[in-house]
Amino acid sequence: MAPRRPAKRLVTALCRAFSGRGCQLAPKRGAERRDAAPSRVSRFCPPRKSRHDWIGPPDKYSNLRPIHFYIPENESPLEQKLRELRQETQEWNQQFWADQNLTFHKEKEEFVRSRLKAKGLDLRTASGQKATLNAEEMAEFYKEFLSKNFQKHMYYNRDWYKRNFAITFFMGKVALERIWNKLRPKQKKTSS
């Protein structure tokens, strides 16, 4: 029996509707370029009364597990800045790896196709299975792919460290703010 699409959309809409004000999910991420990997938001939705971040199932394109961030009702501006920075970093990371994986798979298919064609072989064997190359031949592709993308990965790693240091810095500020709020003397309400 074929799956019913409208039911899936209804479940997702209901899940988001019943999640309440106290539990909002990170915004949907979108492809920024035409050749970028397509965007896909998981149907996963944390329980309505959850007061924690939840890690969802792996993304179809990036293979990373997205985090569904909990937004408390009394979130301070500093906590909001930290959460938004984490969301932005997650979206950036998801998009990078979705694009990288798409490029990898396209180039790998082209490499295999060209090598099989050079050997005079078809893409399918006589038994109908997909023809493959041996480990040594694939090692050439992996080495070439890594060499070609070295600069891109170097910039990614540099930006990844910058973002993580910024997140760690804001986490420290949030922790200090919470400690200060606990230690600060409470204002007594005066009745007139």
Curated annotation (Swiss-Prot):
Subcellular location: Mitochondrion inner membrane
A UniProt-annotated Pfam family: COA8
Post-translational modification summary for this protein: N-terminal mitochondrial targeting sequence is cleaved from the mature protein once in the mitochondrion. In normal conditions, the cytoplasmic precursor protein is rapidly degraded by the ubiquitination-proteasome system (UPS). Oxidative stress induces protein stabilization and import into mitochondria where it protects COX from degradation.
Keyword DNA repair belongs to the record: no
Keyword Transmembrane helix in annotation: no
Topology in membrane: Peripheral membrane protein
Function text: Required for cytochrome c complex (COX) IV assembly and function Protects COX assembly from oxidation-induced degradation, COX being the terminal component of the mitochondrial respiratory chain.
Family: Belongs to the COA8 family.
PANTHER family: APOPTOGENIC PROTEIN 1, MITOCHONDRIAL, CYTOCHROME C OXIDASE ASSEMBLY FACTOR 8
Protein name: Cytochrome c oxidase assembly factor 8
Species per Swiss-Prot/TrEMBL record: Bos taurus
